[in-house]
Design a protein with these regions (language model features):
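Conserved, mostly hydrophobic/aromatic
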Residues: 38, 74, 115, 241, ...
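Short beta-alpha connecting loops at secondary-structure transitions
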Residues: 62-67, 92, 131-141, 176-178, ...
């Protein structure tokens, strides 16, 4: 039923597109265009050298500069990236992990130059280095020191940037690495426990302020095309997070126990054959995180239809943004309370996922927690096993992927009529230009001041 007169219509979620490539200047122009089209938050993609802490002129950065994200090497790059963008009003998500503390420092410094009050800045640093050992691999330090860095960022933001989300605990990448719904929920919760235990045990936050730390934990989740199961998974996340916050950490304020999450729907499930089918996949996956009022995402970014082919163009990202806007502003979805309350089917699946996740959480905690389970190889082995099983089901035709293992006969797609022009391409001269720029920056900086700062 619609909301009673004393309840407000739900507000639209923050709408983002994951974007950035070539250079800070190029990406700044892209962000401005996206904001002008009605995007309500920014999601910054960094290139691999930036993610792993290499300058663009390092030999290991060769061929990767500006390719899958924007290169940021110093504060001048960050200034260029946010030139003309009102940082005090922006809600910026930065997908950065091993070097999160450094990128956050640059962002905060530039925001201060803009005149922004750091205590009012809104946004997120992903900062989940633990999942890098299980999926992406862009780590720079061993697990335990990485957890210490995460802890320091959490403590700093809670004290100095209280509206900032210091970590996005990522189940997203776990699913793409093979996780079942139970594993995805369990391992994300284990990571959250490891982070919160580390902050508590560090002694840097008073016991009276610890509930505020718990309240700033946020999650970044995945949603695949099995959208009913995915919706149930998110309801299970909410139940388990409530239990952990209340029972393990003694948080009494219900607002600080809310499962706060953003989402990008499943990119790995998008297909290169018949890529036009990705449009309906993306829409169905978006429903998983928006249909249920009690488990609705507060920030959504959708991949473009052609992401399996390469870097999407600005128009492709606009199409993904318009999907969100049509759902939020044209339909009546936000007029209603939760559509699934009382559903026996939903409640049974939620209970099944939650029970399985509780058992797996207990198993990991019995090993010594998330760090121990990463160092022993347990978590990785479980994900590899699940991924292998998933691949077998696809190869055997048990799991149907339209256009890949069934319904493969097709007419030529007009969306691909332009061939290579169907995707964005990075100018091959970009890397040389970025390298030249950082060398000029080094030559022009005050080396004595740099040395003094390093000594201090």
């Amino acid at each position: 039923m619609p909301y009673p007169s004393d309840r407000e219509r739900d507000r639209p979620w923050v709408m983002r597109t994951y974007a950035g490539h070539s250079s800070a200047t190029t990406s700044n122009a892209l962000y401005r265009r996206n904001l002008a089209k009605g995007q309500t938050g920014l999601s910054v993609a960094f290139d691999l050298p930036t993610q792993t802490g290499y300058d663009p002129d390092h030999e290991l950065a060769r061929g990767e500069v500006g390719k899958v994200g924007v290169p940021i090497s110093h504060i001048g790059d960050m200034r260029a990236l946010f030139d003309g963008i009102p940082m005090a009003q922006a809600n910026t998500s930065m997908t950065i992990n091993a070097t999160a503390m450094w990128l956050l420092a640059l962002y905060a410094s530039v925001a201060a130059e803009h005149g922004a009050d750091l205590a009012q800045l809104s946004g997120t640093t992903q900062n989940d280095i633990i999942k890098e050992y299980l999926s992406r691999g862009t780590y720079a330090f061993p697990p335990a020191p990485s957890l210490r860095l995460i802890t320091d960022v959490v403590v700093y933001t809670v004290k100095c940037m209280p509206k900032w989300n210091p970590i996005n605990i990522c189940s997203y990448h776990l699913q793409e690495a093979g996780a079942t719904p139970v594993q995805e929920v369990a391992y994300a919760m284990c990571t959250a426990i490891a982070v919160l235990d580390s902050v508590r045990d560090s002694g840097q936050v008073a016991a009276t302020d610890f509930a505020a730390v718990v309240g700033r934990m946020s999650f970044f989740v995945n949603a695949g095309v099995r959208f009913v199961e995915e919706m149930c998974k998110l309801r299970a996340c909410g139940q388990l997070w409530e239990e952990i916050c209340r029972d393990r950490y003694g948080v009494t304020d219900p607002k600080l126990r809310r499962f706060r999450y953003g989402v990008q729907v499943n990119s790995l499930g998008l297909t290169e054959p018949q890529p036009e089918n990705n449009v309906q996949r993306i829409v169905l996956e978006m429903l998983a995180v928006t249909l249920s009022r009690d488990a609705r995402a507060r920030a959504v970014q959708l991949p473009a239809w052609n992401e399996a082919l390469g870097l999407p163009r600005s128009w492709d990202q606009q199409w993904a943004l318009r999907m969100q806007q049509v759902l939020a502003y044209e339909t009546d979805l936000l007029d209603y309370e939760d559509l699934f309350d009382g559903s026996r089917v939903v409640e049974a699946r939620v209970a099944e996922i939650a029970a399985g996740a509780r058992a797996e959480i207990d198993r990991v905690q019995g090993m010594g927690g998330a760090i121990a389970a990463v160092e022993s190889g347990y978590m990785k082995a479980q994900l590899v096993s699940s991924l292998a099983a998933r691949r077998r089901r696809i190869e055997d035709g048990e799991d149907v992927v339209v256009g890949v293992n069934r319904f493969t006969e097709t007419d030529p797609s007009p969306l691909q009529a332009d061939g290579a022009a169907t995707i964005e391409t990075v100018d091959p001269d970009t890397e040389a230009q970025v390298i030249e720029a950082i060398r000029a920056w080094r030559a022009g900086r005050d080396s004595a001041a740099v040395d003094q700062a390093l000594r201090e």
